[in-house]
């Protein structure tokens, strides 16, 4: 909540403009200053600054509410609770699809379809609500230069040929997907900090970061002293910003992650496990055992609300597992990648 922009907490536009000249643009910036510093910046009296502090503090501190009030508020919310993946069996298991208002992580080895899934979800978010979409824009943050507009158009035309039957509709969908390439942790964090205004001005209904692990693993070598602490600090701040945006605007946020090898006598949790090695017992760990797990560690694993793991079965078939979800049980589905994106085997799309 401290990431909330000052323009959205009731301060006058003139005061916000004055504060922005000192790089004070959100609640955290404002509340980090002393009353004396705020008096110098705003030109207000001590009493005026005290009233501002009360206003800003109240805006970024959520009020207590009962479970019934929370349920009633969400039921009355006009925004959908899920974004359908159009993979019927997966949607059914997830009780509707990718949940709005929380973080969904897609994890797996290279080439298993993480980016394909993200591009497919970008198309779906731009569709009219009558087709299961959110009828909004998408912010696609690409850290690996893996996104291609040609693939976006191919998935759109192949998955919904009856809807995308004109050049105009293809142009509309492609113009709603806003691509941002961020190749450093600093650039990614700055982008996330500026997303709030972009979500409002462009009517964004889906945020994708593909991939969060790419920039982190390039810049933070875990073998160097102090890097783990700095890495977790960056991940915590990034997750906090994304959780705020997801909850404040009731939109889904999709992140992709990579895999790494876990070498330890202690077993990882089921939500982290991607593919056990032959020498790993699932009932008890042994010294020197190894397995493939989601990258970025336990701290990051607790930040995401839903985790889907993609993995290979053979050269053609792949598997998607629901490894972590507040709603769904641990289950898996077999899929292939075709022109229209991901296609579940044995489950026909309507």
Swiss-Prot record:
One of its GO terms (molecular function) is four-way junction DNA binding. It comes from the Eukaryota. Phosphorylated on tyrosine residues by BCR-ABL. SMART domains: AAA (SM00382). It holds the Pfam family Rad51. Expressed in a wide range of tissues. One of its GO terms (biological process) is double-strand break repair via homologous recombination. Residues 1-75 are annotated as: Interaction with RAD51C. InterPro entries: AAA+_ATPase, DNA_recomb/repair_Rad51_C, DNA_recomb/repair_RecA-like, P-loop_NTPase, RAD51B, RecA_ATP-bd. Its main location: nucleus. ATP binds at residues 108-115. It is found in: Nucleus. Keywords: ATP-binding, DNA damage, DNA recombination, DNA repair, DNA-binding, Nucleotide-binding, Nucleus. Belongs to the RecA family. RAD51 subfamily. Part of the BCDX2 complex consisting of RAD51B, RAD51C, RAD51D and XRCC2; the complex has a ring-like structure arranged into a flat disc around a central channel. The BCDX2 subcomplex RAD51B:RAD51C interacts with RAD51. Interacts with SWSAP1; involved in homologous recombination repair. Interacts with HELQ. Involved in the homologous recombination repair (HRR) pathway of double-stranded DNA breaks arising during DNA replication or induced by DNA-damaging agents. May promote the assembly of presynaptic RAD51 nucleoprotein filaments. Binds single-stranded DNA and double-stranded DNA and has DNA-dependent ATPase activity. Part of the RAD51 paralog protein complex BCDX2 which acts in the BRCA1-BRCA2-dependent HR pathway. Upon DNA damage, BCDX2 acts downstream of BRCA2 recruitment and upstream of RAD51 recruitment. This is DNA repair protein RAD51 homolog 2. It comes from Mus musculus (Mouse). The lineage of its organism: Eukaryota, Metazoa, Chordata, Craniata, Vertebrata. The gene is Rad51b.
């Amino acid at each position: 909540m401290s990431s909330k922009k000052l323009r959205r907490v009731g301060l006058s536009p003139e005061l916000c403009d004055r504060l922005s000249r000192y790089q004070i643009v959100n609640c955290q910036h404002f509340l980090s200053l002393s009353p004396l510093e705020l008096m110098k910046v705003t030109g207000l009296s001590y009493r005026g600054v005290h009233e501002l502090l009360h206003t800003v503090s109240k805006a970024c501190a959520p009020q207590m509410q009962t479970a019934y009030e929370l349920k009633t508020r969400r039921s009355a919310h006009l925004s959908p609770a899920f974004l359908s993946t159009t993979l019927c069996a997966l949607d059914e298991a997830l009780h509707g699809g990718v949940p709005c208002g929380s973080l969904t992580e897609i994890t797996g080895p290279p080439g298993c379809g993480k980016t394909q899934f993200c591009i497919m979800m970008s198309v779906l978010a731009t569709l009219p609500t009558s087709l299961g979409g959110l009828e909004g824009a998408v912010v696609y943050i690409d850290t690996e230069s893996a996104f291609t507009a040609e693939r976006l158009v191919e998935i759109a035309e192949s998955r919904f040929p009856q809807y995308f039957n004109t050049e105009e509709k293809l142009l509309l969908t492609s113009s709603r997907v806003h691509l941002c390439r961020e190749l450093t942790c600093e650039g990614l964090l700055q982008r996330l900090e500026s997303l709030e205004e972009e979500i409002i001005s462009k009517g964004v209904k889906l945020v994708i970061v593909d991939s969060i692990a790419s920039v982190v693993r390039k810049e933070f070598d875990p073998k160097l002293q102090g890097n783990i602490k700095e890495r977790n600090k960056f991940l915590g701040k990034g997750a906090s910003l994304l959780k705020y945006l997801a909850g404040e605007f009731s939109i889904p946020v999709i992140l992709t992650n990579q895999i790494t090898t876990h070498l330890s006598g202690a077993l990882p949790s089921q939500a982290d496990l991607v593919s056990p090695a032959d020498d790993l017992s699932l009932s008890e760990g042994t010294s020197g055992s190894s397995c493939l797990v989601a990258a970025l560690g336990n701290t990051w694993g607790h930040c995401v609300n839903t985790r889907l793991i993609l993995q290979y079965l053979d050269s053609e078939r792949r598997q998607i597992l629901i490894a972590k979800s507040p709603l769904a049980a641990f289950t898996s589905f077999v899929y292939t990648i075709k022109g229209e994106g991901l296609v579940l085997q044995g489950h026909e799309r309507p």
